[in-house]
Amino acid sequence: MDTFQVIILALIQGLTEFLPISSSAHLILPAQLLGWEDQGLSFDVAVNTGSLFAVVIYFRHELWTMFNAWIASIFRGQQSEDSKLAWWIILATLPAVFFGFLAKDFIATHLRNAEVIAVTTVVFGLLLWWADKMSRRDLTVYQTGWRKALLIGFAQALALIPGTSRSGATMTAALMLGLSRDAAARFSFLMSVPVSLGAAILVGKDLAKSELPIDYQALILGTLISFVAAYACIHYFLKIISRMGMTPFVIYRLALGAVLCGFIFF
């Protein structure tokens, strides 16, 4: 990859990873528009690591508080709102781990194509609109509870289907279950940490076994750009949804789905 490709792909990853608009739908566009080849396993690890650093640093205070409370709940039996939230995040992670392990080969072989991504981009965009408009949206993140956390976790597992959007699916489920927009977004962001960390470790293990040459300059640049873009994305996304809701992202998803359909059928 040349420097221009690194910048564009890292920006796409950083800007779309935490927005409810599907990063996979965007990463397929350069291939469709410009004929770019797959960026490779090492670059995937780099840009995902940049996004992971962004969410960890942005929510560092919440994560540190949750971690300490979680440790206290294990070794001292002290339960608090933050320890419960930590356990709910862990519980919500399990469905994606389970179904990801079972279905990853099937998904990669049969579902990772432009047709599936176009359909899921539109369908789950409409579901996000419905959830945002019709749900009660009055619960805080500390009122999630284990049942709601598990259901949101199943939504995250559903997002293994390309084009669905992990953040889009989890926010849609959280809104349907009564969480406020801010709570739905924060729970989704916090859920991304164990999932992204686990994915980075698994892909990193595959990379360690690979004998392909590694362009370290491209990896460092991609990681930095992805980090900056993802950090800014989280910050401004929380501001946008507090003022305008999910409608701008629904409209964007529908437009993106139409563009993808145009490439497929015309």
Curated annotation (Swiss-Prot):
It catalyses: di-trans,octa-cis-undecaprenyl diphosphate + H2O = di-trans,octa-cis-undecaprenyl phosphate + phosphate + H(+). Keywords: Antibiotic resistance, Cell inner membrane, Cell membrane, Cell shape, Cell wall biogenesis/degradation, Hydrolase, Membrane, Peptidoglycan synthesis, Transmembrane, Transmembrane helix. It is a multi-pass membrane protein. GO terms for biological process: cell wall organization; peptidoglycan biosynthetic process; regulation of cell shape; response to antibiotic. The chain crosses the membrane at residues 1-21, 39-59, 87-107, 114-134, 149-169, 183-203, 218-238, 246-266. It is found in: Cell inner membrane. The keyword Membrane applies. Disulfide bonds: none annotated. It comes from the Bacteria. InterPro entries: UppP. One of its GO terms (cellular component) is plasma membrane. It holds the Pfam family BacA. GO terms for molecular function: undecaprenyl-diphosphatase activity. Its EC number is 3.6.1.27. Its main location: membrane. Catalyzes the dephosphorylation of undecaprenyl diphosphate (UPP). Confers resistance to bacitracin. HAMAP family: Undec_diphosphatase (MF_01006). Belongs to the UppP family. PANTHER family: UNDECAPRENYL-DIPHOSPHATASE. Bacitracin is thought to be involved in the inhibition of peptidoglycan synthesis by sequestering undecaprenyl diphosphate, thereby reducing the pool of lipid carrier available. NCBIfam families: PRK00281.2-4, undec_PP_bacA. This is Undecaprenyl-diphosphatase. It comes from Shewanella baltica (strain OS155 / ATCC BAA-1091). The gene is uppP.
